[in-house]
Amino acid sequence: MLYMLTGSMAANLYAMPRMTRDLDLVVAVSAKNLELFPALFPEEHYYLSLEAALVAVQDFSCFNLIHLATMIKIDIMVRKPEAYRVHEFSRRQLHKINDHPIWVVSKEDLILSKLEWARHSLSERQLGDVRNLLSTECDFEYLNTWAKHLHLTDILTRVTA
């Protein structure tokens, strides 16, 4: 199954860490691939609603896993078929966390995603994460190109001002 870590946990790899309560994963998954989930996430260790997962796959939305021992929630977002989302997924980067290889969204694509979330939710936390990420080295040409394409130029300009 193809995946990438995104959200605040990914941001913690690129910039000053902040506390977060969950994990966010983007997965490239089909209804047929869902058959693998019970083996990957056995019910004695995880709560998973296959019905909710199937709806999420059909709608390109999200569903949750909960690790029962720690009660950590994992938000699983089904990768959308839009050109940018496919491109974003192709740019994911392999990181090592505690000697485990983990696919992670690129820093610039994470910034763009957080700008999108902030635009829709008006979340100051997302904008704070963006400012934190922008305080490190970034590919501004890439950011500006995709911000224009995704209609995020105004919010990116506001955050960088």
Q: What feature does the model see in each segment?
A:
Residues 1-161:
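Compositionally biased terminal segments of proteins
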